């Protein structure tokens, strides 16, 4: 986060380029009344950056560019879709592949053959792995890894560094001190709702 926003604005001129319109402000205030935190991901929350200047919403994307609702073209210097768009936004080959799957039907209670193909490719790329387990989110994947580690070692304490989601094993690091996750997730996060029995089982470094 930038502490001296006025100095930042003076040096970059962003205050003139990105000043939020009434439409965007109204939409963001509405979102915060309907959705806890305003959206589903902390990493996409504009309040973490420049609350009065950050575009907040996009209308379209291409390559390394995003367009705000006011159609202002900007270079995405953040994390390109929370790290998922490593090839850039709206990559033709990727878009065509996605459309092809959608046209065939992208959801069923049956298994899709692509799952096996992807697992095979991942094992090929990572010879240290014998099998692959898919998860819906990074937080879920981390929780699976923690459970496997605890099961195989018969030990319960976990040492970690960085952001690992919102599951109890991770947030429990803040039961002892609300400052434990300051450099990993966010400052002063309260561990309310996390079982107190998990205290002293997760340790950030």
Where are these predicted regions, by residue range?
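Active-site-adjacent loop/helix segments that line or gate small-molecule/cofactor pockets in enzymes
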Residues: 17-60
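Glycine-rich loop-to-alpha-helix module at the N-terminal edge of alpha/beta enzyme cores
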Residues: 73-155
